[in-house]
Design a protein with these regions (language model features):
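Acidic, polar-rich low-complexity tracts and alpha-helical solenoid repeat scaffolds
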Residues: 35-635
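Bacterial Sec-dependent N-terminal signal peptides
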Residues: 1-40
């Protein structure tokens, strides 16, 4: 019995001791946890002072934290950074020395110590420490990187380059540090040296060519940088005549400098070396067209077609050639400079040439493509282009409508079907069949995908404006202008503000103006001038007078009445002192002298007038640019 009592007493005592131990451990854990929370809070506060540049406060907190956490890497690094920002290099050095006591051969700490001596104005000591690091293992590339990183941080790019070159020599590896050296050479505007380094990369790994082009572009945007790179690549190509990546970079550099003919020559070589059967030339033609270099684009596409191309690219190359001829015709065909004239039909014997392109020639190419590749998406695109030329260049409304109608029956591209319907509606507007125009837009609105709806809505708003339904037009325009990401937002806002601003001046004046705008859309230019002049005579006190006068000037230009256009614009600048369009009118005078009359001096005088009389105008920068171009100054 006594034994049992003793056992119970011993057990109770053991339990009490265990509970005491558990409670003690809990108390210690709670204390440690509280301490840890306090450390984290202080550390965050110090880091926030760092981020805001309050370095003194950061130092105070880091120093207090270091007393209880002498081995904490985060605290040590934060304190060293703060000392460096305050230029307390001696304290930063002492901090690093304390760390080195535990590991006196640590390369990273030694390189940092050397960097601190360098910042403190003791470069010889810094060099000595750094070379101690390097001598530990002269063939270890990472040691050179450690030292160079310190020099780069201090913006001592020349010395960093020396370290990298020393590393190359020691390791007998000329491929080391290529990207690092290229970047440093570029930063020092040593473009030839930078290009030599990038060439090493692309020769070792041709798949890196696109990446190297992006790196070269960091300085080839400057003419001196592009010229330097061009010289290096030309020399490399001359020494390595079978290396396609070098030709590709050379072609790219020519393209960057807008030297498309020279780029085309490189693509001919690339196509031959790679046995690409025209696909490389085809890609060049596409890119040149995207950059509006239509003559070399046309040459490339024609060479593809005339060669022995892969069968799958033939229709696309023919379409690309036709598109290039079409674009070249804009500047060379007399119809393009005198819109509104009608053209005779296109004969099969029409002459087609890159040097004397015509819209008739372009249409002949499209028609031939349709005949040879019927019932294809390419044929559908060609037919759409025929409709566009007939409408926008020849104003052949019947021919355009027939083409667009046929495109809508072809099932190869829903987007082209929508575009054809939009264009057909424009043809109906030009025919003054506004009821059919509205019907086309209503059908599109109910069936077209989201990207087309705002375009359709804007056209409907214009139609409402032409028909003097100004409230309806405003309601539709407000829907469009509410979408800030829409490409049409600015156009919608301009028309909306124009309607709202001028509707209060009187429905009759705005109705007359809108009818004149409709006649412009229908290319009834002479009748439109009469309508705008009616606004001037019948509503002389409205704000529409300024806009009507400017419209008359533009229409005189479209009718090739250049002197009359100049007279109208001078009326705005000289006789309408309250007009907010005087700067625009003066700018148009300069543009007429520059582009239509080819009188360089009078154009310069007109642009200088913009600078002198309208210093706050939005046209000032453009006027300055035009003056520099006309004088042959560097832009």
């Amino acid at each position: 019995m006594i034994t049992m009592q003793c056992l119970h007493a011993d057990l109770a005592q053991a339990v009490r001791r265990l509970l005491q131990i558990i409670l003690s451990l809990c108390a210690i854990a709670v204390f440690a946890g509280a301490q840890q929370v306090d450390i984290v809070a202080k550390l965050r506060l110090a880091q926030s002072f760092e981020q805001t540049g309050v370095w003194d406060r950061a130092v105070t907190i880091y120093e207090s934290l270091l007393e209880s956490n002498p081995q904490n890497f985060v605290i040590l690094e934060g304190l060293r950074r703060s000392y460096m920002e305050l230029k307390r290099y001696d304290k930063a050095m002492e901090l690093v020395r304390q760390q080195l006591r535990g590991n006196p051969t640590d390369e990273n700490l030694l390189s940092i110590l050397g960097g601190l001596y360098d910042l403190a104005g003791q470069p010889q000591t810094a060099d000595s420490i750094w070379h101690v690091v390097i001598k530990k293992d002269p063939k270890n590339a990472n040691l050179y990187r450690l030292i160079a990183a310190q020099l780069v941080d201090h913006r001592q790019y020349d010395k960093a380059i020396e370290i990298y070159l020393e590393g190359r020599e020691a390791t007998k590896n000329q491929s080391l540090f290529v990207e690092e050296l290229a970047s440093l050479y570029g930063a020092l505007h040593q473009y030839e040296s930078a290009t030599h380094e990038y060439v090493k990369i692309v020769r070792a790994n041709p798949q890196q060519m696109t990446y190297i082009q992006s790196r070269l572009s960091s300085f080839t945007g400057r003419e001196e940088g592009r010229r330097a790179a061009l010289g290096v690549i030309k020399d490399e190509v001359a020494r390595n005549k079978e290396e396609v990546p070098l030709y590709s970079i050379l072609a790219w550099l020519f393209m960057e400098g807008k030297h498309y003919e020279a780029a085309l020559e490189q693509y001919r070589i690339i196509d031959r070396l790679t046995k690409a059967k025209g696909s490389e030339l085809f890609q060049f033609g596409q890119r040149a067209a995207q950059e509006h270099a239509y003559l070399p684009s046309a040459k490339a596409f024609r060479e593809v077609v005339d060669g022995k191309p892969a069968a799958n690219i033939v229709p696309f190359a023919r379409f690309g050639y036709a598109r290039a001829i079409e674009e070249l015709s804009v500047e060379n065909d007399t119809i393009a400079r005198a819109p509104g004239q009608l053209s005779s039909g296109v004969g099969r014997g029409s002459t087609i040439s890159e040097t004397q392109p015509t819209f008739q020639g372009a249409m002949a190419l499209y028609e031939s493509l349709i005949m040879d590749h019927p019932n294809t998406e390419t044929a559908m695109q060609a037919l759409f282009r025929i409709g566009t030329i007939r409408f926008t260049r020849f104003f052949d409304l019947s021919g355009a409508a027939a083409a667009f109608d046929k495109v809508r029956t072809m099932p190869f591209s829903s987007n082209l079907m929508y575009e054809a319907t939009l264009s057909l509606a424009e043809v109906q507007t030009a025919r003054n069949d506004l009821g059919r125009t509205r019907g086309e837009y209503d059908r599109l609105l109910s069936s077209s995908p989201e990207p087309y709806r705002d375009r359709v809505l804007f056209r409907l708003a214009e139609l409402n404006y032409f028909e003097a339904r100004f409230d309806s037009a405003s309601a539709v325009l407000q829907r469009i202008s509410g979408n800030a990401t829409n490409d049409l937002t600015n156009d919608a806002l301009q028309l909306l503000y124009f309607i709202q601003e001028n509707k209060t001046a009187g429905q009759a004046a705005l109705t007359e103006f809108a009818l004149a705008d409709l006649m412009v859309r229908q290319r009834k230019y002479s009748e439109a001038i009469v309508r705008f002049q009616s606004v001037l005579t019948q509503h002389p006190t409205t704000a529409l007078v300024d806009d009507a006068t400017m419209r008359i000037g533009e229409l005189q230009l479209l009718l090739n009445r250049v002197d009359d256009a100049l007279a109208v614009f001078r009326t705005v600048t000289n006789d309408m002192p309250a007009s907010i369009l005087r700067d625009h009118a003066q700018m148009r005078i300069g543009e007429i002298y520059e582009n239509r009359l080819k009188n360089k001096q009078k154009a310069i005088d007109a642009y200088e007038h913009v600078l002198a009389n309208y210093p706050t105008s939005l046209f000032v920068e453009e006027a300055r640019k035009r003056i520099r171009m006309l004088r042959g100054d560097s832009l």
